[in-house]
Amino acid sequence: MYMRRGLLSIFLAAAIFFTAASDRAQQPAAPQSPQLANPAPPQGQEPPAQSPQKITTVVNLVDVLFTVLNRRNKLVPDLEKSDFKVFDDKNPQEIRYFSKQTDLPLRIGMLLDTSNSIRDRLKFEQEASTNFLFSVIRRGKDEAFVMTFDDEPQVIQSFTGDAGTLRDQIVKTRAGGGTAVYDAIYDACVKELSHPPRPPGDQPDVVRRVMILISDGEDNLSNHTRAEAIEMAQRTSVVIYTISTSTQWIQLSQTDPNKLANRKTHLTEGDEILQDLAEETGGRAFFPYHVDDLDQSFQDIGDELRNQYSIAYNPTNSVLDGRYHKIRIELPEHKGYQIRSRRGYFARANGDVNVKPAQAPTGKSNAP
């Protein structure tokens, strides 16, 4: 009898130890290794009960924020869960959570190219970035930081909600050196936007992570690749909006009477890179002629970021292989509507959330 009790005690102790070790194995990764998907349910939804099976389900949840525009490029705010279909690598998925995300606090990374190649457009960069911050930031709710990059990235102003403070640092920037665009994106995601300041007071702990990249897109010094920069933005749920500083268009437009209408037909290689960065992460690329051309665009960006939908699902293929998965969201009954979202995500790898994809997601997509 005593021997049986002793064996039972040993068995229970081993079981408790195994359960604790298993729980620790499911803890989030360290700050320098951001998770690919937000493990928490979307705002306004109840989390699942704390059973071992459902804990695993929450960890594998894929959460996608997206914007819907009508034929006139106006926001569509009144759609319901039943209107949408979501596909993971072309496989239909069951939508587990659906919500409308409105008036979210913004956490903005303003990335300014200060390399020698944009010397003639530095004033444009300063004016464009300052105008954006004053147009979009709401003091007490939104915050932004400023990072410059030439030979290497450098944060010149940490997160603040004061647009005037941000402007004061922006106007001090000077141009010179090479261009490390991809390193700047990667560092901004990992070091700043992966763990941005939480909203003050009793506001819900949900923020929108945004990057505004102003550059000619011509990288020549980065240690990271474009695929790695996009991967990190997708892992940290960062949406990239790009603004081109290309001067080739300005020279061409002097003999083109349809200068603004034809801008996208004359994209430089750098412009195409900027477009790819934006589209892969659910943002937009802008190719302005003058700073004034951006005024309405900035207002549109602010409206988009504060009026979005959220869909979450558990992938039917939940193998932890670190592989890149394409996401497609459809509106079967609204064929003329546009859906703007990130194009995919990286599945967790068994024991390593930072496994690189077998194929870089830098090509074009058939997503709406």
Tell me the role of every PLM-derived stretch.
Residues M1-F11:
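Bacterial N-terminal signal peptides that target proteins for export
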